[in-house]
């Protein structure tokens, strides 16, 4: 079953935080159907998720998880733990395996007792807890290459953000079904922060600025 119809989404863990990033292009065959598609959602105070695949199926899952998270908080007075949220979604997807939701999901969250958590789920309910990083969608092979080359478990949040953005940028340059901007979220013990477009542009601009190379005596002789 091929569910990678378009999109690139990435998630990674660094410095006791989770970083999620997605592109904004929605495709209908070879047509760019939407240039501002929302693929990054806040589920609870400490949980966010990305979607790839069928838009209708993914949006139905988002609505369901938001409702379940609210019910959990009403009943217990606590936020739903990331593992419980991912397990709930895994059960929902598996129960619909005969008529599956055509979507791939990344769930990132912060557990106040266990720290940063990252999960990937397939359309049939298969769930993996990721200890480093993950990617979904048609641009994921390209994103994985960037993540593999640049990932360090001890990197700072700022370095993790730049790595996630680099992975998205590379995928958007090579995958025709990914593009039209980036959505970004960071999840820490302080909760979910979804970045504004202006904030993302500022980070991207800072990444373009390259430090000037020092001129050595040898290079000065060559230039004469």
Curated annotation (Swiss-Prot):
GO terms for cellular component: cytosol; proteasome core complex, beta-subunit complex. GO terms for biological process: proteasomal protein catabolic process; proteasome-mediated ubiquitin-dependent protein catabolic process. The formation of the proteasomal ATPase PAN-20S proteasome complex, via the docking of the C-termini of PAN into the intersubunit pockets in the alpha-rings, triggers opening of the gate for substrate entry. Interconversion between the open-gate and close-gate conformations leads to a dynamic regulation of the 20S proteasome proteolysis activity. Its EC number is 3.4.25.1. HAMAP family: Proteasome_B_A. Component of the proteasome core, a large protease complex with broad specificity involved in protein degradation. The M.jannaschii proteasome is able to cleave oligopeptides after Glu, Asp, Tyr, Phe, Trp, slightly after Arg, but not after Ala. Thus, displays caspase-like and chymotrypsin-like activities and low level of trypsin-like activity. Belongs to the peptidase T1B family. NCBIfam families: arc_protsome_B. This is Proteasome subunit beta. The gene is psmB.
């Amino acid at each position: 079953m091929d569910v990678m119809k378009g999109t690139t989404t990435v998630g990674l863990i660094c410095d006791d935080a989770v970083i999620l990033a997605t592109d904004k292009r929605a495709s209908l065959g070879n047509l760019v159907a939407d240039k501002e598609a929302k693929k990054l959602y806040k589920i609870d105070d400490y949980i966010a998720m990305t979607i790839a695949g069928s838009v209708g199926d993914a949006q139905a899952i988002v609505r369901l998880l938001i409702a379940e998270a609210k019910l959990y908080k009403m009943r217990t007075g606590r936020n739903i733990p990331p593992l419980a949220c991912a397990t709930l979604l895994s059960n929902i997807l598996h129960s619909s395996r005969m008529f599956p939701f055509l979507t791939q999901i990344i769930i990132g969250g912060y557990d106040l007792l266990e720290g940063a958590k990252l999960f990937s789920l397939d359309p049939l309910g298969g769930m993996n807890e990721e200890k480093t990083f993950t990617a979904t969608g048609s641009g994921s092979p390209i994103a994985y290459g960037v993540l593999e080359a640049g990932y360090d478990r001890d990197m700072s949040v700022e370095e993790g953000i730049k790595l996630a953005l680099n992975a998205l940028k590379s995928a958007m340059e090579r995958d025709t079904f990914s593009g039209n901007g980036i959505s970004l979220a960071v999840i820490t013990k302080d909760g979910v922060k979804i970045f504004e477009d202006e904030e993302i542009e500022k980070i991207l601009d800072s990444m373009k600025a390259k430090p000037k190379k020092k001129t050595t005596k040898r290079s000065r002789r060559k230039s004469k």
